[in-house]
Amino acid sequence: MKYGDLVSVVQHKFQISCYEPVFHHSKDRIDRDYQAVSYLSKVEWEISGLDPSSAAISSVLEFEEVCRLTNERFTAYSDGGYIPPALNQVLHLMQGIISRVLGDLRPDEWIEACRFGPGACFKVRGTTSYDKIGAKPSVTMDFALLGLALVNSSPSWISSIRGQGKDDFSGDEPLGYPKPLTLGDLQLVRGGNFSLVPKKATTHRDIEVQPALNVYAQLGLGAMIRKRLKRSGLDLDRQPAKNRELARLGSIYNHNATIDMRGASNTISKKLVEFLFPVRWFCALDICRTRYLENFPEDGDLLPLERFSSMGNGYTFELESLIFLSIVRATADEMGVKLRMQSNTHVYGDDIICP
């Protein structure tokens, strides 16, 4: 900063190897240096020579290529291709863990759990539930029929969309029940809307703004997965504080490792989820996700997705928490390491703590 080289400042990487042997350096100094590097990387400066939007777009394409290759590998495995024995064992352990955590998928529970969240929806103005219930719902073509059934199950929702004039009530229906909507009352879209939000000076974060009915159903599945994770010992509602405390203790006693992955949700591929999850759960997750990115600056405005879901999808956080938990548990089982969920193992999205 002294010489005005802001590019080098925001691109600087903290490397613990620079402090080895660690006992020659003050822990306070290491902490201060790490905090300084982290803070400066996130300052929202406009710096000549850096294009955070282009960096984010390149990152999306990079992770899509990773997912494409992963999908090809799982397709080859399904067709009888070679899979390393150790990897095969871990993957099947993960299947069993995920199946036990999830149990049965109950459609009635899914319908009850569906809701709108606080974020934006594609093709809908406003972010409140009132805005979303009163707007013409957006939905992907794959989910249109199920989304229509969700709306038509709620007379008040139909009335909010169509109004309550005398012509909106059907003589064939119970008194006061509005005419059901048809597909023509929905906004059919091809996928989610590509959007960027500030993250660091060097790159933005990509967000996929979901169609209204898709995210309404996605949040229901997310709530169901969250409830089942809690029954299995992982309470995502209390995890942030628990993870911070375990990370602090690990830094003092050196008995826990902390793992924070780059682009974690963007590297969960379609075929991975299909391989790991029970069929009914996979079908439910798959039908309400988006398969394309609209308004993507490259690839002709419409990007077919190799990833299964991303930030913006209503169940991505719970989905990745379950997958990463299964990786930790399966790997520990294979290595003969004993895990204690409340003392040495925690997962919160892509923030992982393990022995």
Where are these predicted regions, by residue range?
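Core nucleotidyl-transferase/polymerase catalytic module
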Residues: M1-S17, S159-P355
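Non-catalytic, polymerase-adjacent accessory regions of viral genome-replication enzymes
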Residues: M1-S195
